[in-house]
Amino acid sequence: MYTPEEKARIKWACRRGMLELDVVIMPFFEECFDALNEQEQRDFVSLLECDDPDLFTWVMGHGRSENLGHAAMVDKIVAHNLSKVR
């Protein structure tokens, strides 16, 4: 479980250098992070350490992370955002 201060740092890390990533990652954090289990939360935090071009490639479905935790988290993020569109 993360403290409020840690969650504030995680939220700040959700702010990316690419607007396209901001509109995908931030809503997922705000709406889903607390419902993730501890491992998924760690995977999400670890995913935020990846470079923007890699994240963009994975989110757009043009590639897949070799890290299984990252790949699963990207799948969750994409599914969450698709559910909001439909």
Swiss-Prot record:
Biological process according to GO: succinate metabolic process
GO CC annotations, alphabetized: cytoplasm
Gene3D superfamilies: Flavinator of succinate dehydrogenase
Pfam families per the UniProt record, alphabetical: Sdh5
Chief place where the protein resides: cytoplasm
Cross-referenced PANTHER family: FAD ASSEMBLY FACTOR SDHE
Protein name: FAD assembly factor SdhE
Family, similarity comment: Belongs to the SdhE FAD assembly factor family.
Function: An FAD assembly protein, which accelerates covalent attachment of the cofactor into other proteins. Plays an essential role in the assembly of succinate dehydrogenase (SDH, respiratory complex II), an enzyme complex that is a component of both the tricarboxylic acid cycle and the electron transport chain, and which couples the oxidation of succinate to fumarate with the reduction of ubiquinone (coenzyme Q) to ubiquinol. Required for flavinylation (covalent attachment of FAD) of the flavoprotein subunit SdhA of SDH and other flavinylated proteins as well.
Key words of the record: Chaperone, Cytoplasm
Subcellular location per the Swiss-Prot or TrEMBL entry: Cytoplasm
InterPro entries per record: SDH (IPR005631), SDH_sf (IPR036714), SdhE_FAD_assembly_factor (IPR050531)
